[in-house]
Design a protein with these regions (language model features):
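Iron-sulfur cluster-binding electron-transfer modules in prokaryotic oxidoreductases
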Residues: 1-217
Length: 217
């Protein structure tokens, strides 16, 4: 493929849902774009940051920035990710929270759905089969923070036959590793309760659940 991107797969794709990464590659290939992995990838560091291990997170961030700089600066290809949390960390939390310099790289790191939308808007084509399905979509907090929700929604609306309902923007309550901790369970459930209720209501009317949410979103 003449056009290439580097894929920051993150921990969720690597350990929990590798099919998501495989599906993304199929979509990009169908658009005429090849996919490479970074020469070396570490966890984006958000779980470490959230639990106070900033020194360890900084070491991982430095490794990732070096690999991203190689992709962008040497190979001349952008970096995309399927996790909005990873994307937010690579672009904004590295310099602001960890004091890791990503100068010259930030604008070349994108969420996969935003990159896909831009390419379609520029004239690239993607063969999309009709998908007669009702879905509800929940936007993760970090995607909201970046202001990139619109790109994902517009991309979904391009799928023929897909009936999309967007839930009101609400935190799911998981907040990375916060909701996994026993002492935080009641608070986590209380935060997510309105969202859970809306999902149950839509499920009763035949809607399927669709989200960008990953473990650290």
């Amino acid at each position: 493929y003449k056009d290439q991107v580097a894929f920051f797969h993150g921990c969720f794709v690597n350990y929990n849902h590798p099919q998501l990464g495989k599906d993304l590659i199929k979509v990009l290939n169908a658009m005429g774009t090849g996919v490479q992995l970074l020469s070396k990838e570490k966890c984006c560091g958000v779980p470490l940051i959230a639990n106070g291990f900033t020194d360890k997170a900084r070491k991982q961030a430095i490794t990732n920035v070096e690999s991203i700089r190689e992709a962008v600066g040497v190979k001349g290809i952008p970096v995309i990710a399927t996790s909005s949390t990873c994307t937010f960390a690579l672009r904004d939390e590295y310099p602001e929270v960890l004091n890791v310099d990503n100068k010259g790289l930030r604008d070349h790191i994108e969420l996969a759905t935003r990159w896909l939308w831009r390419k379609l808007d520029e004239g690239k084509t993607l063969p999309l089969k009709p998908l007669p399905l009702k879905v509800v979509y929940h936007t993760p907090c970090h995607m909201e923070k970046m202001g990139w929700t619109l790109y994902t929604l517009e991309l979904l609306r391009k799928i023929p036959g897909l009936e999309l309902t967007v839930l009101d923007s609400q935190c799911c309550g998981i907040a990375g590793t916060y909701g996994f901790k026993k002492e935080n369970y009641p608070t986590s459930q209380a935060i997510g309760a309105p969202l859970f209720r809306h999902r149950r209501e839509r499920r009763g009317s035949g809607h399927h659940r669709l989200r960008n949410l990953q473990m650290a979103d």
